[in-house]
Amino acid sequence: MKIIVQRVKNARVTNDTIDNQINKGYCLLVGVGQNSTEEDVKVIARKIAHARLFEDENDKLNLNIQQVEGEILSVSQFTIYADVKKGNRPGFSNSKAPEQAKDLYQKFNKELEGYGLIVKTGEFGTHMNVEINNDGPVTLIYESQDGKII
């Protein structure tokens, strides 16, 4: 699994059927790879839930999302696993098949909720408009494989 974590002042995802937004927190762009497993879901959700990406009174990144009462906007994004080595058009064979990816994506969001986090989502497998108001910017890439952070 690969997840781009962006610390945001606010973020919003919309399409014809949804309109979800958050204030302070993380916007997560979630990629589910061919070899992603439920163990990857658990380890990466735990890592993100406990990540200290917010400044304390000394401007050090010492506070996690719970401590600042932040929220999460989780958006599925299979293009994170694009292969751009050959030609000019990306290939997506490294992404998990849609039904399996959707299942792991939903489990990932539930796992985050299990840490007491408020998680709002986009709509899996559809075209969406995503508005991200980065804070910092603070942007990190988390990746798990074989149940371990890599």
Curated annotation (Swiss-Prot):
Q: What is its main location?
A: cytoplasm
Q: Record's domain comment?
A: A Gly-cisPro motif from one monomer fits into the active site of the other monomer to allow specific chiral rejection of L-amino acids.
Q: What does this protein do?
A: An aminoacyl-tRNA editing enzyme that deacylates mischarged D-aminoacyl-tRNAs. Also deacylates mischarged glycyl-tRNA(Ala), protecting cells against glycine mischarging by AlaRS. Acts via tRNA-based rather than protein-based catalysis; rejects L-amino acids rather than detecting D-amino acids in the active site. By recycling D-aminoacyl-tRNA to D-amino acids and free tRNA molecules, this enzyme counteracts the toxicity associated with the formation of D-aminoacyl-tRNA entities in vivo and helps enforce protein L-homochirality.
Protein name stated in the entry: D-aminoacyl-tRNA deacylase
Q: Does the keyword Signal apply?
A: no
Keyword list (alphabetical) reads: Cytoplasm, Hydrolase, RNA-binding, tRNA-binding
Species lineage, top-down?
Bacteria, Bacillati, Bacillota, Bacilli, Bacillales
Organism per entry: Staphylococcus epidermidis (strain ATCC 35984 / DSM 28319 / BCRC 17069 / CCUG 31568 / BM 3577 / RP62A)
Assembly mode? Homodimer.
EC numbers, comma separated: 3.1.1.96
